[in-house]
Amino acid sequence: MAAALGAGGGAGAGDDDFDQFDKPGAERSWRRRAADEDWDSELEDDLLGEDLLSGKKNQSDLSDEELNDDLLQSDNEEEENFSSQGVTISLNTTSGIVTSFELSDNTNDQSGEQESEYEQGDDELAYHKPEEQELYTQEYPEEGQYEGHDAELTEDQIEYGDEPEEEQLYSDEVLDIEINEPLDEFTDEEYLQAYGGQQGLQVREDCEAEDDLDEITDSQVASETHEGGMETLELQKDIKEESDEEDDDDEESGRLRFKTERKEGTIIRLSDVTRERRNIPETLELSAEAKAALLEFEERERQHKQGRYGSRRGGRRGGSLMCRGMGDQRRDNSERGRMKEHRPALLPTQPSVVAHSPRLIPPPQPQPPPPPPPPPPQQQPIRSLFQQQQLQPLLPLQHPHHPSPPQGVHMPPQIETPRMMLTPPPVTPQQPKNIHINPHFKGTVVTPVQVPLLPVPSQPRPAVGPQRFPGPPEFPQHTPGPVPNSFNQPPRLPLQDQWRAPPPPQERDPFFLGVSGEPRFPSHLFLEQRSPPPPPPPPTLLNSSHPVPTQSPLPFTQPGPAFNQQGQQPVFPRERPVRPALQPPGPVGILHFSQPGSATARPFIPPRQPFLPSPGQPFLPTHAQPNLQGPLHPPLPPPHQPQPQPQQPQQQPQHHQHQPPLQPPLQPPHQPPPQHQPPPQHQPQQHQHHHHLSAPPPPLMPMSQPQFRPHVQTAQPQPSSSRMQCTPHQGLRHNAASQNISKRPMQQMQPTAPRNSNLRELPIAPSHVLEMSGNRCSSTPVAQVKSIVNTSPPCRAVVSSRSSQGNTDAKAKPLSPEAQPKEEAKPEAEFPDEDEETRLYRLKIEEQKRLREEILKQKELRRQQQAGARKKELLERLAQQQQQQQQQQHQPQQQQQQPQQIYGSQTSMEQEELAATPSPTNGNPLLPFPGAQCRQNVKTRLLVKNQDITTASVQPKAVNFVPPGANVQHQGQHLRPLKHLRQLPHKVLQVKPMDMEETPHSPQAARVTSLQGRPQDTKPGVKRTVMHRANSGGGGDGPHVSSKVRVIKLSGGQGGESDGFSHTEGQPQRLPQPPDMRQQPTRKVTLTKGVPQQPQHLPVGPHMYPAIPPGIKSIQGIHPAKKAIMHGRGRGVAGPMGRGRLMPNKQNLRVVECKPQPCVVSVEGLSSSTTDVQLKSLLMSVGPIQSLQMLPQQRKAIAKFKEPAHALAFQQKFHRHMIDLSHINVALIVE
């Protein structure tokens, strides 16, 4: 215990100090890791401490009373601890943190006080040791450290008289606090899941052991001290959870309990975890050893100057975390992963930390003055200091570590949460890993940010300890998913941090030592809360800072709403279990301002955050950083999704601003934060873009569907979530990091979003999104329609722009009066201070969008005209052949298509959901797909003409076919969220203009809702129905396709029916006809691949049903739809814009094939290694061939099938097929 506490508490602090001071870099970090691990898992720390710290610290064991006897003159660990406290007092001058900590400890409970004092004693030992180290640099040997401690023992003993008993009690309590059991179990689980808390500890200890083998012995001792420290944490937890105070009687029994329990679950896991952590740290340890030597001196000096306070605090609470930071930045990176792990570990530890949390909260206030050296950390009370010490040697890393210990402190509340949900441990592993990796690759900066993911909450939490109780609601959210634990906890802290004003200031400064520590943590917390994605921001101090602002508003706006935010954030980041990432609650609030950032955190997240997811851990770390991001968020979303969804109606407008889901409640609070953090938001947005870009992966998958559904719930809220989801879901989703940030921006710049240009614009888009977010929030129908229209078709951008101007203007105008006022009102509400800026940004962005749309429209019109001319020629030449061939081919394909339609209709719901997932998986393809399908749509229009000539059925197919493309575009760009948004405005317009649209609307609305499986809101439901229609191919597609449909109408809907080629002319009609077309596009929206068919099926029901038999539609739909799908997959995947361009070729080919039904197939792009035998076998797999001509010089082959149907089938099957590492382009040649 003493050792554990020495590491975690008094001895732990001493260990930390030793680690940080005695063995400046390696040992101190080594011991701090032990201490942090004590923090993370007291039981594990006991085990680890015994293993690592026993050798390392006899002093730690003194903390356990055994080591204290040896190291300290006193027999009691309490003595050492108390001497530590004496040191603390003596050091209080230097480090008010200790005093503050004592105060906080005392404030919380006697047990808490004892524990805190005990830990303080340990920490003070550590602090004292730093002083002693300064005094007794020669004594840096562990014993020297302890002797140094002894030297100040008089002071410590002076205080010791008062608190030794408390320390003893505390040691007993700590030892007895069986919270350690659950904590240890939890820690074990978390450690195992995360990296194995003790393994992480051992790894850290090992890393530091590498730095100091004798420290390993100390570490083992410290492990005991850790037991003490862990027990102290447990005691604190008991303080918070009085259940374990009963065990105060048996220190040894408590220790045995911890040991046995650790052995039962934690010890084994600890060994496993230790291996894992050792592995991770080993990666970092190479530098760790080298840095250990370098850092030993640097850290000695720094710690002597600042490190003592931070060391002790960090030593005790953030000790191991601090050690990690101190030990090595890389180690910190790995440690950070561990810290995240530890966080789960901390969760177990956090019960005590919870106790500490209150103390920390009081100390933070007292602390700030004492720790002027690390003033920024002051806010994050002791942890801040700890990490500042570490940060000083490894400022970036140490800050992350710093947050980690604070989280450890804050974790206490979260420990309760972890208890509630052991799932967090898995989250932690993901996060730590992500963070681990990101720190490794990105370096210290990333490490700090990533560390904050878990640690950040801690730091805010010390101050926010009590506020954390608002956090408890987050605990449920936290509890919902393991990942949420790491993210949610941070969000919790962020919430509290938000409440705590300090984090916001820190948002900016934090990235560096002082401010960096705390603000950065909040920002990291927020970002990392969002999802693993936050780790990406770490490199960018602004990122974390921006997240902080992003989340700061969150914190300000909602301690309680924070939960909602978290809940809703989960809806997006967690709902689609990213991200986080992420896109986590904290980011949500901020997402308001920097939706892109948050969503990206998310979700840029964490899903860049996920968010993933899921990576998550995207982050998302993504988020997997979203992800954090993805796994992290997904768990939360389930529990909170219900809450967020109800809130989403309110948040619909806000959702555009990123994750308003949380913001409905938060918005009132949020509005003020937005004012304060509008500037941060821009930074956050941009940073979050990066942040989420890397992080969104975590939330990626998780977010996509939930977001779609949330989008369905509220076209706008979900778009924000969609942004988050997009981040994880697609490479776009990573861009979606930005896109998540600005789903609206995506919508506004959707054409851009599919391209990568959106990412670059996103920083602007984010601000504009934030500003436009306000506009689009309320004017979601209008702004989003515009953005949707604009963004929905990258290739269709021109048509979409036209239609978007036509339809969007038509719809936006109808909606505009209502929606735009809302835009202004909500932006004002959401961005009271940013209103003017936001409006300016929005206007600028909108103008840019309009310009882009116009340019895209012009390009699209040219393309369409060219395609139309070509197609007209082809149609004229091949009208007869095409009719005959089409009839022949369509009949067989009808059979194929009809089953496909049935399948599509059956799978429309599934595919809608998949569309979210497929969109992410096919996200890039989808995005390109839209481009390709834009061409397809043009081609479809041409085809529609041909088909109209040939058959009415072609029209529906063409329309459906185009809609799949259009919807695919939507899915690709915004996936469904944009679709939903578009659908929403379209639906409104559709309902008004088209009864038919409305008719499918209601049935599909129900169906969509069922598909969504979420009745989110009546309006969201309607929107959802529209969106879902888009997804399920119902009336919703119409709205969804509004922009695309307009394009489609140009190509298929109107064009097919009346304007075969008057796409431009059709635009005006598109507005009226768009509903019809939209329904058809809806079908195409339904799924990227299956959807196109499915949409046909649906449209047959709602729109095309009366008009044309499904069979006919299937026939035509099969050609265009299949081709579109194939091309979309093949070339469409090639690139968003490239796809579009490629698609014209495909479309031309298609037109050719559809019209003449040629038997000759041209295979281009063959690899030089491809033989005629291989080709012939490919050809023969489809049907009998008449001839095969190889043109190696042209890398081309021309084959003639006996049946045109076989040629078409071959083209559809093998176009963009990879043979010998070469993608072949299969074109039908008309003879």
From Swiss-Prot:
Glycyl lysine isopeptide (Lys-Gly) (interchain with G-Cter in SUMO2) crosslink, residue number(s): K1019
SMART domains linked to this entry: RRM
Matching InterPro entries: Nucleotide-bd_a/b_plait_sf (IPR012677), RBD_domain_sf (IPR035979), RBM33 (IPR039878), RRM_dom (IPR000504)
Gene3D superfamilies: 3.30.70.330
Biased composition (Basic and acidic residues): 20-36, 224-240, 327-344, 820-829
BP GO terms, sorted: mRNA transport; regulation of mRNA stability; RNA export from nucleus
Amino acid composition bias (Gly residues), ranges on this chain: 1-13
GO molecular function: lncRNA binding; N6-methyladenosine-containing RNA reader activity; protein-macromolecule adaptor activity; RNA binding
SUPFAM superfamilies per record: RNA-binding domain, RBD (SSF54928)
Compartmental location: Nucleus; Cytoplasm
Compositional bias of kind Pro residues: 360-379, 469-483, 531-540, 604-618, 632-647, 661-682
Region named Disordered: 1-168, 219-261, 297-436, 452-761, 796-840, 876-932, 998-1080
Phosphoserine modifications at: S41, S243, S271, S792, S816, S1002, S1010, S1032, S1051
GO cellular component term of the entry, any: nucleus
Listed Low complexity bias regions: 380-398, 880-901
Residue ranges of coiled coil: 840-891
Top-level taxon in the UniProt lineage: Eukaryota
Role: RNA reader protein, which recognizes and binds specific RNAs, thereby regulating RNA metabolic processes, such as mRNA export, mRNA stability and/or translation. Binds a subset of intronless RNAs containing GC-rich elements, such as NORAD, and promotes their nuclear export by recruiting target RNAs to components of the NXF1-NXT1 RNA export machinery. Specifically recognizes and binds N6-methyladenosine (m6A)-containing mRNAs, promoting their demethylation by ALKBH5.
Protein name: RNA-binding protein 33
Source organism: Mus musculus (Mouse)
Lineage: Eukaryota, Metazoa, Chordata, Craniata, Vertebrata
